[in-house]
């Protein structure tokens, strides 16, 4: 499966992260010694379920690397247009592709095994769109103080994931609907006019479970949707504010230090011989000793014969 990484966002002066990006792409902001997006590419590169990685909004000049084949597509100016361009690029590689991963470039704590978990979990059914959510307790346990924004449901409080999976036809159907939803994602009232005020009111009153919400929105839009409840917080830990940037910087720096410490201890630790190795060494020693005795005996016998 191909992964489309959205990396075209450039913070404006009024954006909280502008002082960190200095007018460059948000994806290139430094996190523990790497561009933020490089951590995401490392995770995708190590995922068994990823074939190609398509980066939207950057160029080869960015100096990024990935263990999987990586391709660049220029920024199309709008979120939906970027996704459509990424899907079209994926179909260039293989017209039979049915699903793609849509990945944000600002989730640097993502790991390879989490990407594989998502693909394996989603492919148990054949839906149009798989949208991930993380329960509040999972997020707060992993990243206390992250100050995420949660949607309050009847059965749980959740925040949205930034790694999702969609059928490629979603890039060719319902485009007007998607454009409206994405364009109004900061305005609940505008979204309400699209998904229905009844659904929004039920959400506000906490009358909907996660399953109810998915069913209502799917019916309204006319797709088969499925919510994926993440057991991991990392795919939902996107960086939008300075305190979140500092949080992931500290987290990844700590992980690097722990890994370096383990590697250092492993190098210093003497290699213990296994029981089998000990037996072999003992047998070799006996054989060598016996051989030395045999040589000495032959020499002694030869000396007597000469006398």
Label each PLM-derived region with a short phrase.
Residues 260-307:
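Intrinsically disordered, polybasic Lys/Arg-rich low-complexity tracts
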Residues 103-105:
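Active-site acidic Asp-centered loop
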Residues 56-62:
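Short, polar loop motifs at secondary-structure junctions
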Residues 1-22:
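N-terminal nucleotide-binding beta1-loop-alpha1 segment
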Residues 43-50:
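Short, acidic, metal-binding catalytic loop of nucleotide-sugar glycosyltransferases
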